[in-house]
């Protein structure tokens, strides 16, 4: 049976085009459309779609408020369409925080000319989050509850259906989560490296808000994200977390307790030595490199600089970026972990390293931060 899709947009042209694109996949069936946020809320409750594609700027009720209402009344997998502007990035991040699972840039020109690439990407994203919706429904009664925290910033609003799990002292009372927390291997670490894609913004926020200001390692983060989004995302994370988080810039010196987010549309490399490592940002126009930034490239450079003194983590994401970079790290003696299938929005990138035998441990998102701290504490 095809996944049911509700298309929400105030543009009649965009509604028709998105509907035509999605209906080309036999796994998808657009069951209805909505022209504003309030209509989306009403139809989500009535029709119970598997996936909703949602515009942000709409009359009567905007996309962000619509997401909040839908997640409160009839939780549904939602894909946001976002403009490639700083303001569009901020709005999209708000929508993700409210409960949306993923986003795509709203490119009218590519949709208008019926680009095969744009259509294929849209169908792929919708199918993937529809599968997540189906998987989540099957696990609803058995999924352990998350543990809430009080974050640094009073501006954080945690969605009640997807609360931010945390342990202010990195200790949780949830027995199921505690069971997954590993004992330290006793290895020495100089760097924490994280790679992610679809579902990454929420996963990263959930992990990073739990880390204390005195976190002993620098952190590099590669999140597949457009160039217009990464500065806004880094700024948002910095406002919520105790550690410092910034969009990486060329020449940045890696410091403990600081996280560096790879800028969208470019590549982030690590150079120097393990005790004086710096970030190098490159403009890469090579058509051979699909992702900009690329987890493989950043992880590979970390392997050259830090050898085995890296804890590398692959979180939720589509595709297999990070597999070769993680393989390079592992060959140098680094520790590689993955996010488990149950807690991923898309179990693609973690699955790639799991199947290749690269990951040493597969952890739930709820237990990831505490496990990281335990591992690097060396007992």
From Swiss-Prot:
The keyword Iron does not apply. Residues 185-379 form the CheB-type methylesterase domain. SMART domains: REC. The modification 4-aspartylphosphate is found at residue 55. Residues 4-121 form the Response regulatory domain. GO terms for molecular function: phosphorelay response regulator activity; protein-glutamate methylesterase activity; protein-glutamine glutaminase activity. It is an enzyme of class 3 (hydrolase). The active site is at residues 197, 224, 321. Keywords: Chemotaxis, Cytoplasm, Hydrolase, Phosphoprotein. InterPro entries: CheB-like, CheB_C, CheY-like_superfamily, Sig_transdc_resp-reg_Me-estase, Sig_transdc_resp-reg_receiver. The keyword rRNA processing does not apply. It catalyses: [protein]-L-glutamate 5-O-methyl ester + H2O = L-glutamyl-[protein] + methanol + H(+); L-glutaminyl-[protein] + H2O = L-glutamyl-[protein] + NH4(+). Phosphorylated by CheA. Phosphorylation of the N-terminal regulatory domain activates the methylesterase activity. Transmembrane segments: none annotated. It is found in: Cytoplasm. Its EC number is 3.1.1.61, 3.5.1.44. One of its GO terms (biological process) is chemotaxis. SUPFAM superfamilies: CheY-like, Methylesterase CheB, C-terminal domain. One of its GO terms (cellular component) is cytoplasm. It holds the Pfam family CheB_methylest. Contains a C-terminal catalytic domain, and an N-terminal region which modulates catalytic activity. Involved in chemotaxis. Part of a chemotaxis signal transduction system that modulates chemotaxis in response to various stimuli. Catalyzes the demethylation of specific methylglutamate residues introduced into the chemoreceptors (methyl-accepting chemotaxis proteins or MCP) by CheR. Also mediates the irreversible deamidation of specific glutamine residues to glutamic acid. Belongs to the CheB family. This is Protein-glutamate methylesterase/protein-glutamine glutaminase. The gene is cheB.
